[in-house]
Regions:
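...with weaker cross-activation on analogous glycine-rich loops/strands in unrelated enzymes
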Residues: 122-200
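Bacterial peptidoglycan biogenesis and beta-lactam-recognition machinery
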Residues: 107-113, 185-187, 217
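N-terminal capping segments
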Residues: 29-146
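Low-complexity, Gly/Ser/Thr/Pro-rich intrinsically disordered linker/tail segments
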Residues: 189-224
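N-terminal Sec-pathway targeting helices
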Residues: 1-19, 26-28
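Residue-level marker of positions within ordered structural domains that often coincide
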Residues: 76, 106-107, 184, 198, ...
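Cell-envelope/ECM-targeting effectors and their regulatory/trafficking segments
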Residues: 19-20, 35
Length: 224
């Protein structure tokens, strides 16, 4: 009987320790995504960064680099993950989701994604699966951006072996997610992505492309 009590006590203590460790991990990771950038790990031939011929906002920085810098600058504000509706479309309370990384990246280059998507829905409404258009949220849905970029952006290879085709500032769309392609690469030459997937994400820049089998599209914004 005494041994049984000891076993029960030890089991309870082990369970308590596990619960405490899980709680600590939850507190450390929840909504504490780091904006620290990953190190460049590619040691092969130099892959020149693509530069767009466009400079929409006239700041002396081409659109491709502007979009990349816009994504980096946005995640440097440390947005917390939350899906919510905003009357003005763009989140203004320090929260956001994956589509907001892309929207703010394009905004820094001089493009209002909310307005662009809204106008495109007016023109190509039959291409979008939308019953009642709402410009405040339509541009923040991955399924709509998939249609939008297919219609309005340059569509590129989704083959990760074609590493030079993947450039910082490109846009990649997965089944239920979207991200900006980073200008830094892993040891295979495959670029990282800058994205916002969930409240437990360790860093905004992550090496995930090779882990995904659901890449639906790879795009470059050359529509000035």
């Amino acid at each position: 009987m005494k041994n049984k009590k000891i076993m029960i006590r030890n089991a309870f203590l082990c369970l308590l320790i596990v619960v405490l460790l899980c709680s600590a991990l939850f507190c450390v990771r929840y909504q504490h995504t780091s904006s620290k950038r990953l190190a460049e790990r590619w040691r092969g031939d130099v892959i020149a960064q693509y530069h767009s011929p466009l400079d929409k906002d006239g700041d002396g920085m081409d659109d491709q680099v502007d979009i990349l810098e816009g994504a980096i600058n946005y995640v440097n504000t440390h947005p917390k993950y939350k899906s919510a509706y905003y009357a003005g479309g763009y989140p203004n309370d320090g929260y956001g989701v994956c589509t907001d990384v892309v929207a703010y990246a394009l905004k820094e280059a001089g493009y209002d994604l909310m307005e662009l998507v809204s106008k495109d829905i007016e023109i190509h409404g039959d291409m979008y699966d939308i019953e009642i258009p709402d410009q405040n949220i339509d541009f923040r849905r991955v399924k709509n951006l998939y249609v939008f970029f297919n219609l309005n952006a340059e569509s590129l290879s989704t083959d990760l072996k074609d590493i030079s085709e993947w450039q910082g500032g490109d846009i990649v769309i997965f089944k239920n997610h979207i991200a900006i392609v980073s200008d830094r690469r892993n040891q295979h030459g495959v670029p990282y992505v800058i994205h916002h997937a969930n409240p437990f994400q360790k860093t905004y820049e992550e090496d995930i492309l090779e882990k995904h089998d659901d890449i639906r599209g790879h795009y470059r914004w050359n529509n000035g």
